[in-house]
Structures are given as C-alpha cells and as structure tokens.
Amino acid sequence: MATTPAAAFEALMDGVTSWELPEGPVPSELLLTGEAAFPVMVNDKGQVLIAASFYGRGRLVVVSHEGYLLDAGLARFLLNAVRWLSPSPGAPVGVHPSLASLAHILEGSGVEAQVHPEPAEPLGVYCISAYNDTMTAELIQFVKRGGGLLIGGQAWHWASQHGSDQVLSEFPGNQVTSVAGVYFTDTYGVKGRFKVSKKVPKIPLQVRCGEDLRQDQQQLLEGISELDIGTKGLPSQLLVHGALAFPLGLDASLRCFLAAARYGRGRVVLAAHEGMLSAPSLGPFLLNAVRWLAKGQTGKVGVNTSLEKLHTLLLEHGLECSLEPHLTSGVCVYCCTAYSDKEAKQLQEFVAEGGGLLIGGHAWWWASQNPGRSALADFPGNVILNSFGLSILPWTLDPGCFPVPSADSLNYHFRKALSEFQATLNLEGGNLEKNWLAKLRVDGAAFLQIPAEGVPAYASLHRLLRKQLRLRLSGFPAVSRENPVAGDSCEAVVLCLATELARSGTDCSELAQGLGAWSCSSNLCPSEHTVEINARNPSDDAWMSTGLNLPNGQLTEVCLCEAAACAGLKLQIGCHTDNLMSASKLSRAPVVTHQCHMDRTEQLVSNLWGGLLYVIVPTGCNLGPMSITIKRAVPAPYYKLGETSLEAWRSCIQESPAPWGELATDNIILTVPTADLRALEDPEPLLRLWDEMMEAIARLAAQPFPFRRPERIVADVQISAGWMHSGYPIMCHLESVSELIDETGMRSRGLWGPVHELGHNQQREQWEFPPHTTEATCNLWSVYVHETVLGIPRAQAHPALSPPERENRIKTHLEKGAPLCDWKVWTALETYLQLQEAFGWEPFTQLFAEYQTLSDIPNDNPGKMNLWVRKFSEKVQKNLAPFFEAWGWPVEKEVASSLACLPEWEENPMRMYI
C-alpha cells in the first residue's frame, strides 16, 4: 500500500496524463495544514484544488467541487482515488445518494459501487459531498478506523450565506476534513491551466480566507493590558509557523513567548515555560485561554498532576476541573507540560477532533543536555507541537513584564514574512521591516531544522527556498570582515537559510558556487585519505583532528568499521562553532559548522561552508586506535609536537590550499589561518613553550598532566562574545593569532588573554562565587603562568596589577564600606593575591585538589564562601576570618567561632587600611 505522500501521489496519478475538468463548476481553494495533507492538483496560480491526507488508520481525498466527482472526464483519477482509499483490494464502495451518478462512473471503470445513506459496515470507501452536517462524527470515526473517504464540495457559496468569518470552523465539510489538515475556504479557485505534476506539488506559503485569526487573538487577550512573565522561570522562544497558528505574547524584538493555533476542529495555546501556566499574574489570560479552548462547551477541564497550581487557580474561578495523570476521555480541555511525548498521537487526535490543549514548557535545558541533537526534531514537546504549526526553540528569552502587543506586532507571521522576503528576492516589491527581517532570520533557520522528509508541508517550503536561493546564486552575499552584512538585512536572511538548507540535507554544491572568501576553493583536487585516530576517551567529548579540510559544498564519503559505527562517534565539519544568530552585524554566516552521527559504515556528508574535519569521540569511548577513510577532502596544515617532521611541515604549509591549519601537542591545539602559519619555519620551540604553560596550568589546578583532553584555541573572523571567550574550544579574534604563535613575544610580553581563558576552563562551581569571582579567579592562572613559566612578574603582566593600581582599588573598596556587590573582577582577585603573597601557591593547589574529593558542598554563595574561609584557614593554620570580613565576605558567627582557636594572622595586609 502507498503509505507515504510520494507513493500515494504516484498511485493517485497513475495513468492520469491531463486534467479534463468540467467548465461549469467554480471550485474553492483548499487550505492544507499539519503534517499529513498533500496537494494532488494545483492550478497555475498555486491554488490547491484537490488534496489527500491520512488520519488514524484511514485516508481522505478532498476535491474542491462536488461537480468534479460527477464528471466522466475525471474517471481515471476517480478510479485511482477509490483504489488508493480502499483499505484492502475489492473492499465495498459506498456512495451517498447526493452523488448517485458517481456510482455509474466507477462501475464504468470496473469498480462496483452502491448507493448508501451512511458509511456503515462493511464499506471500505465512502463518497459524499461536503454539505452534509448530520454524519460528522460517523465520517471521522469511519476514517479513523481505516476507511477511505472521497469528499467534494465548495465553500464560497456557503460563506456567502453564513458569513466568511465562520467558514473554516463551521462549514460542514470542514467539520470532517479538517481533522486530517484539509480545509475548504471561501476563496474562489481559478479555473486556469492545470499541469499534471510528476511529484507532489508544492503547498502555497499563504492561503487567504475570510475567517480572520485576529478575532481569536482578541478573545484570548480581552481585558488584558500586560503579560507579566518575570517571575516564573526562564522561557524559551516560540516558533509560530503553521497557517492557522498565531502569536499572543511578544517582546520588543518580536520574540514570542505565548502563542495559539487552530488545528482540525480543536485549538491549542502554548506557553514558553510551564511556570507561566500557574503564574497568578497571568491568571486573567489563563482563564481566557481555557474558555477559548473550550469553545463554549461545558465539559470538564483535565489538568495534569504536574500542574497542581493551575488546577487550584481554575477551581478558585469556578471551573469544573480535575487532576489527571494523563489525557482521559470526557474532558473538553486538557492542560499539561511539554516534557513527554508518550501521548503525542493521542493529544494530536484529541485536538483534531475538537479538544482544547493548554501546554507549556521550555526546550533550552533539554538542548543543553542533548548536544548534537535538534530540539526542533527531538524535543518531546515539539514531537507533539510541530504538527499544530507551533514549536519550542532551544533559545531563551529574557523574562519581564510586556505590554500586550500592538496589532502591527501581532501581524508578524513566519509565513507572511517569508512571502514578503520571496517577493523582495524576486524584485517584486516586498515590504519587510528591519525587525521582521531579523526575526525571519531566526525563524527561518529554526524552521528548516524540523525534519522535512515525507512531510509535504515542510518539504514544500524547502523546495521553494532551494529554488529562490539558486536563482540568487549570482548575488550570493560574499560576507567577510571586509564586507560585513547587517543582521537585519536580506543578505543575512539568505546566509541563514542557505546554511540550514544545506544542513537539512540539500545538495549544497550548487549553492557553494556563489560563496565569497569564507571558504576553501572548490577547484582543488580532493582525494581519498585514511587517517588514524585514538578513539579512547576518558574525558568529555573530544574533537580528534584528521588533518583534512573539506572544500565548501563538497560532498565527502566517510568509511569506517562496524565497531566504530556503533561507538557513538560523530563527524564535525568546521571548528568555528560560535553561533552568531543574535549578532547585529555578520562577518561570516551565523552557523558554519555541521555535525552528523557516524552510525553507518559508509556515509555521505557535506557543509556549505566547508571546514576542517574532526571525529568527535564521546566520553567513555574505549574503541582505541582506529582507521577512517575520508574521500574528496584535501590535506590541511597540521603539526603535532613529537610526531611531525620539519620537512613534512614545511612541505605542507607551502602546498596546502586549505584556509586553516593546526598546531598540536597532547595538551593544547591551536587553530589559526594557514596564511599565519606559513611564516612559522619551526613550530617545535613554540609548542614546547605552550606545553610548559599547560603543565603549569594543570599543576595549579591539581589536574593530571598530560591533559585528559587537550584544550583548544580557535581563531575566527567573528566570535559570539567578548575579545575572547572560554569553552571547548576557546574562541578568539584573528587579531590574537600573532600572540598565540610568536614564541619570542610570549616570553617578553606574555599573553594574558589566552591564559585568562584557559583559567576560566579550570574554574569549578564548588569554589566559585558567581558573579563575584567569575572574572577574578581565572586570573590566578594568568599570574601563575606569567611568573613561573614566562618569568614576568605580576606587576608587569597586566597594567591592572601595578602596585599603585592595587592599593587604590583596596582603598576605594573599603571607603565604600566593602560592599559585597562591588567585590568582583580585579577587586576580588586582590583578595586571592594577598593570600598567595602571604602563603604561596601551595595552599591553592592543595585546596583545589581537596575540593575534588569533597561532597555536600553548599549550593549558595554564602555557604560556599564560608567553606572557603574555613578550609583556607585550616590549610595555613591561621584564623583568616577577620581578613575575609574586612573584604566584606558574609562570614558566619559559627565559622568565625570555630576558627578562633587558630593563631591570629598578624601579617593580615588589610589591617593597615582599617
């Protein structure tokens, strides 16, 4: 049986070489939503006039005028439709009396059909017009149980009699077909030329109809002037992408935190954090939401047991509701969180058949715990929500109190913005505000992460964008440091959409032809290489360099053994992992790296922007040494201390066309432009110095040396935050490259910044007191490395550590009364430096080691600070409580009393200031 849209379309169009439509009937345009519906016939204006869909175990074919079901010129298609709809070959076909002549057309094609007033047993297929309003429930259940429904009609005449503003929800045919994502609209279908498509036609971006969703927005926001989400957790941003979905709560940048949608016969309201569903400040909105979801029904509201506070709020306002562990029958509205997809299908059917769903949750925490996985595809809430045209994004939104959006703000919609963007690219006008462009950049990139394979609603949009971007090739943004583009420009949107299209599986070789400077030339001669890596990793996920570069847009084939394919390895293309989606100006595309799971022995993968190739070995992997064959890549400059010969290095840097190269030891790997490496005749002295510094870093941190996982520093044309930032990898600007690879300069001038970031990577939450020490204790490593390895005293290592500067900071802090809120950065560092100057580095090293073995460490700053006071005092056998109190630390009486038995610290440097 044809169970996919592509196979279904092929079955429906078998032998249909032309559309012989009768001239008389005026059809209605069909609106398709959800993930199951797909077009079958589309006119030259892009209007869908015949569609098909799946629901439950059954199927539907929807025709935009009943006259099409009664015309012998469509006999071949009608025969195909009945055969495809049939749950089994030869299943009985019933025809409603209003379509009696259809039975004759089918019989003329060899299909026995009988006139039946209703879809009773043992019928497998039932044919009916869209005007019957007495069998809605029976028809839905007939399809849900596995039957096939052929239904035809137009809604424009009904709308003229009953009002266009009710057509989607009240037109009889929509009461049935909407459960499967197909709606008759009041818009006339143009009777133009009809091309027979070879594959599933595209679904239009927008379909206009008389029913205005702004009425729903007004009902949900009635009596509300502001939406206060400031106290109930950190929300995610929401993506509103369905044709019948709409925003309700927006911040000043159009980032959405409340949204709603119609779906089938039901409705959905989504909050970007479950805490919003119990916030007293949102009480009026929540009551509006439940009433809107109920659509005037008097049934019970079911509240999941995870939302007890919401249950209490609803009871207080007189609503009949009950706590339920899961969705139960008999409720008209169900309220739950978005953290489980066990009931995804049941919830979708509940809404499709008329239920109301109030749901809330965020995806940012899930994304942080599932690196490498797409929240749009895999987050449980999105498994439920995507088909409703709503999704929860892995990005946060600053909470606060926001005014109810203006009508203009609520007018923003992803599909509308994309339609205007398309018109702009086609030089057909287009009217996109700057804030719409900035929002479209984020929304478009997010939408393209929803898996599109086998889902016409998403695949159609992918096809549309591919076509637009291919037409745009000659003007593809040549973004670079010399030619940056604004974050709220059409060029930025193109960069984002092209990147995500390529990441979603689109062949990007054609797109890559229009790239500018941020790439390795595709005119190289890539070849096959076998590389050896050590796939034993006791530490966190580690990038293993291959020494290879993939040209932009090039498709590479990766081959590995069965054992490796089962080891959880990933392939990463590119090392510039900073996401620049929030940047106001772009010197490169926002996302230029790509990861994929290496779960097959042979795999094809590409990246629009090319990049160095890495194998990511997961923590705990014990695979050991292994070989990987990589085709169509080029060698990149790579020097490993103790392994690469000088001859091989010099040959590589002169010949390699790759734009980036790496210098590596067992403890640190530097990724810098090849152009900078060409001046480095012999990397060995430089890397030996780096290893000395890394050994010092490990020594102070009481960590093993060599490092369990080498640290990485990557230079980039643009990074996401600051001059440099810590992490894996540490990121820096190109201006910092010279200090990273200049041994002479490092020894004479030092390199405070890079070691500062390496220090950040050594900080541990057990003895960190954010935000006070975040930018302070990391500098202990900068001081230590400069003094013990580079021979540069602290007073010369950084201007802020000159004696006058230090003394002035102490006096200023004490003159203010030593407020803890001001104890940060250099002021906080001074406390630690005074301890080090009195007691040396050994107490620090010993404490860092001891903290690795401690349990039951407090989670709050006061608790952690008092533990540090006690531990450091015990380590040096001096009562340091007065010293820390002088700095404004909240030393508890109990701690001070316990330390009173220790000798007084007579040399306390703070005495002279008090």
From Swiss-Prot:
The alphabetized UniProt keywords are: Cell membrane, Membrane, Transport
Occurrences of domain Peptidase M60 (ranges):
541-840
Instruction: Provide one Gene Ontology cellular component.
Output: plasma membrane
In alphabetical order, the GO MF annotations are: transmembrane transporter binding
Matching SUPFAM superfamilies: Class I glutamine amidotransferase-like (SSF52317)
Chief subcellular site?
membrane
**SMART domains per the UniProt record, alphabetical:** M60-like (SM01276)
Output the InterPro entries linked to this UniProt entry.
Answer: Class_I_gatase-like (IPR029062), M60-like_N (IPR035423), Pep_M60_3 (IPR042279), Peptidase_M60_dom (IPR031161), TCAF (IPR051244)
Where are the bilayer-spanning segments?
Answer: none
Q: Name one Pfam family in it.
A: M60-like_N
Where, subcellularly, is it found?
Cell membrane
Q: What does this protein do?
A: Negatively regulates the plasma membrane cation channel TRPM8 activity. Involved in the recruitment of TRPM8 to the cell surface. Promotes prostate cancer cell migration stimulation in a TRPM8-dependent manner.
Q: Which family does it belong to?
A: Belongs to the TCAF family.
Its quaternary structure?
Interacts with TRPM8 (via N-terminus and C-terminus domains); the interaction inhibits TRPM8 channel activity. Interacts with TRPV6.
Query: Can you say what this protein is called?
Result: TRPM8 channel-associated factor 2
This chain's source organism reads: Bos taurus (Bovine)
Task: Give the encoding gene's name.
Answer: TCAF2
